[in-house]
Design a protein with these regions (language model features):
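Pan-zinc metallopeptidase signature
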Residues: 228-280
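Short pre-active-site segment immediately N-terminal to the catalytic Zn-binding motif
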Residues: 135-153, 184-188
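Active-site recognition of the HExxH zinc-binding catalytic motif
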Residues: 84, 131, 153-166, 196-197, ...
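Short helix/loop segments within enzyme catalytic domains
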Residues: 74-95, 187, 191-234
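Catalytic Zn2+-binding segment of zinc metalloproteases
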Residues: 159-174, 208
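Long amphipathic alpha-helical segments used for membrane anchoring, targeting, substrate engagement
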Residues: 1-62
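Acidic helix-start/capping segments at beta-turn-to-alpha-helix junctions
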Residues: 61-69, 73-82, 89-113, 179-180, ...
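Catalytic zinc-binding patch centered on the HExxH motif and its immediate surroundings
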Residues: 106-132
Length: 280
């Protein structure tokens, strides 16, 4: 991706080196929403807690490589701001830009405390995306999804959850919690995640029109989408898959919805909720 020398976002909060507090306790209040909207990408939602410890300032000096990733995700966030402001404007709506919070080890959010192993996530309580930049290496090494555009896909996917929050989609799914069987509820969660993949594809569609993509970028995004499919993660972790427990979609589904958004570049074709399981 052509990103160096381009505008970065002013909506980045750097909390690297700050203590996020102890991990423990239970989730309550708005923290429950995070089960619906945050993206595991290999993480564990039970790590999120309802604790509200004080965050302490520490002097933090990252490596040159880490700072380059920080600069990169800031440019990606700026691109999402340009794209979604334009898309929302086309539909007669105003886009409220989210904040990207960079952290190390653990972080306090309005949805509770999260550790790095949670993976990148979006918290609707403060309309913020949270990313530990060590995930860039994890994406490459653990998930075998290298490349800067793989990380760009992750950021764009989390922004996709913010779009869902603004459009009210995530709340509609949240309201079903406890009202339907768990297996059925998982199907709604899966559609929420696949729609976020679609929105990430919409962003990539516009970025291509801006002539910021390089050869191989889309392949990197598709590889990342495939790497975080429920079937692939479960197979690697336990040697078998349990389809009724899927909450993010299979590798093929995640690839398909990202690419569908990339080709369409609009909101209309991203309604995952009107389709049957076989149509996903």
């Amino acid at each position: 991706m052509k990103w160096k020398g381009r505008k970065s976002s002013s909506n980045v909060e750097d909390r690297r080196g700050m203590s996020g507090g102890m991990i423990g306790g239970g989730i309550g209040g708005v923290g429950l929403i995070i089960y619906l909207i945050f993206t595991l990408l290999g993480g564990d939602p039970s790590i999120l807690t309802g604790n509200t410890p004080n965050q302490q300032n520490n002097t933090y000096t990252g490596t040159t490589e880490e700072q380059e990733v920080a600069d990169f995700v800031s440019v990606v966030l700026a691109d999402t701001e340009v794209v979604w402001n334009e898309v929302f404007n086309e539909y007669g709506m105003d886009y409220e830009e989210p904040t990207l919070v960079l952290f190390t080890n653990s972080v306090q959010s309005a949805c509770g405390v999260a550790g790095s192993s949670t993976g990148p996530f979006y918290c609707p309580g403060d309309q913020s995306l949270y990313i530990d930049l060590s995930f860039y290496d994890e994406l490459s090494e653990k998930f075998q999804a290298p490349g800067d555009f793989a990380m760009a896909y992750v950021v764009a996917h989390e922004v996709g959850h913010h779009v869902q929050y603004l459009l009210g989609t995530s709340k509609q799914v949240q309201d079903l919690r406890g009202k339907v069987a768990e297996t059925e509820y998982n199907r709604y969660l899966k559609r929420l995640e696949l729609q976020a993949d679609y929105y990430a594809g919409v962003w990539a569609h516009y970025v291509q029109d801006m002539d910021y993509l390089e050869e191989g970028d889309i392949e990197e995004a598709l590889n990342a989408a495939s790497a975080v499919g429920d079937d692939r993660i479960q197979e690697a972790a336990q040697g078998y898959v349990v389809p009724d427990s899927f909450t993010h979609g299979t590798s093929d589904q995640r690839i398909r919805w990202f690419y569908k958004g990339f080709e369409a570049g609009d909101l209309e074709n991203g309604d995952t909720f009107k389709l049957s399981e076989n149509e996903l």
